[in-house]
Every structure is written in structure tokens, then in C-alpha cells.
UniProtKB/Swiss-Prot annotation:
It is found in: Endoplasmic reticulum membrane; Cell membrane. GO terms for cellular component: endoplasmic reticulum membrane; plasma membrane. This is Aquaporin-like protein 2. InterPro entries: Aquaporin-like (IPR023271). It comes from Saccharomyces cerevisiae (strain Lalvin EC1118 / Prise de mousse). Keywords: Cell membrane, Endoplasmic reticulum, Membrane, Repeat, Transmembrane, Transmembrane helix, Transport. It comes from the Eukaryota. It is a multi-pass membrane protein.
Length: 149
């Protein structure tokens, strides 16, 4: 009988005199929507930087493509207005969009690589060294490149 009473005492030892279970700790309730999703200043700052980068890249792509389309549509060689699009215009517009994407990707991948760009933003690197590091960087080369031999 004493063995059973010891087990009973162990089972109710975590109860306070009112019978409330002190071992149960309720989970923290989120106070705001931001704490529920674990969004702090650093996370918001990173999302803002990513959004600005996406905006700049998209704007550069669309602006370059817009300029190419205007140049193609105002060709002085076409003296009369054709009823449809001229094949030369279509090829120029297609190549313009392709080169616009290529230029935007090249600018934002190599020029704004996070390690180099953060050094520039925080004043540890100058603009000229930022540009030179793009040229000299081995990231641009491949194994068969004559420069890297």
C-alpha cells in the first residue's frame, strides 16, 4: 500500500493546493501579426532590398526593350506605312528583348553581386574598384579561357 501511495504522491506533486497543474506551460500567444510570422526589422529590410532589386532589374529590362521597340518602329528606311509588321522590325524587336534580358542579367548578377555590392554600400570599396573587380574576377572566366591560363 505504501508503494501505491508514493506513486500517487508523485503524480499529484506538480499540482498546487488549488489543484491546478503547474507543469503545463501554455505556448506563447502571438501579440501581433508580425510576431506570428516572425517578421522583424532585419527581415523587413531584406524584403525591401529584394523588392528594390527586382524593381530595378525589371525596369531596366522593360526600358531597354521599350527603346528598341521605338527605334524599330521609327525606321526611316520604311518610307511608306506597310499594312503589317515588317520582318526586319520583328527581328529587331525580338533581338532587342533578348539583349535587354541579357544586359539586365549581366548588370545585376556581376555588378551587384552581394559580397562586392555590400562592400561598396558600406563605404569599404570605391566605385572604380567595384568595376575593376568585375573585370578581373575569375567568376567571368571558364576553364578554356585564354586569360586564365
Amino acid at each position: 500500500m505504501s508503494n501505491e501511495s508514493n506513486d500517487l504522491e508523485k503524480n499529484i506533486s506538480h499540482l498546487d493546493p488549488t489543484g491546478v497543474d503547474n507543469a503545463y506551460i501554455p505556448p506563447e500567444q502571438p501579440e501581433t501579426k508580425h510576431s506570428r510570422f516572425n517578421i522583424d526589422r532585419g527581415t523587413l529590410r531584406n524584403h525591401f532590398i529584394a523588392a528594390v532589386g527586382e524593381f530595378c532589374g525589371t525596369f531596366m529590362f522593360l526600358w531597354c526593350a521599350y527603346v528598341i521597340c521605338n527605334v524599330a518602329n521609327h525606321d526611316v528606311a520604311l518610307t511608306t506605312e506597310p499594312e503589317g509588321s515588317h520582318p526586319g522590325q520583328l527581328i529587331m524587336i525580338a533581338l532587342g528583348f533578348g539583349f535587354s534580358v541579357m544586359f539586365s542579367i549581366w548588370c545585376f548578377w556581376w555588378g551587384f553581386e552581394p559580397s562586392r555590392f555590400s562592400l561598396f554600400v558600406f563605404g569599404q570599396s570605391h566605385l572604380t574598384s567595384q568595376m575593376c573587380s568585375d573585370v578581373v574576377s575569375s567568376d567571368h572566366c571558364w576553364d578554356g579561357c585564354w586569360w586564365c591560363r
